[in-house]
């Protein structure tokens, strides 16, 4: 069974999500940005979500996490919770 590890940042607006993505692409540390801006409790841990399999997260997450590039900031991804930046840190098929 496939497994992946990822971290994310959750914010309310697409605009904020894009602004944070730009900061990270310009050299800001993903974990620091998550701690400062993410509205998800995982933000306190730098956005770390741990390891999970398909179907354990919302559909929009699964599509990105199990198909997107590893170690690249992906998003904005819109879910019922808001807008996410995702970084897949590892994946096993």
Could you describe each region identified by the protein language model?
Residues 1-26, 41-56, 86-93:
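Well-structured core secondary-structure elements of compact alpha/beta domains
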Residues 49-52, 65, 73:
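Short clusters of hydrophobic/aromatic residues that line enzyme substrate/ligand-binding pockets
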Residues 4, 71-72:
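Short beta-strand-initiation
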């Amino acid at each position: 069974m496939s497994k992946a590890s990822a971290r994310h940042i959750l914010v309310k607006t697409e605009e904020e999500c894009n602004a944070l993505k730009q900061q990270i692409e310009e050299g800001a540390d993903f974990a620091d940005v998550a701690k400062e801006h993410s509205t998800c409790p995982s933000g306190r841990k730098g956005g770390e979500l741990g390891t999970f399999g398909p179907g354990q997260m919302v559909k929009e997450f699964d599509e990105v996490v199990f198909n997107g590039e590893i170690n690249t900031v992906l998003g904005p991804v819109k879910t019922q919770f808001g807008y996410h930046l995702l970084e897949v840190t590892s994946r096993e098929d």
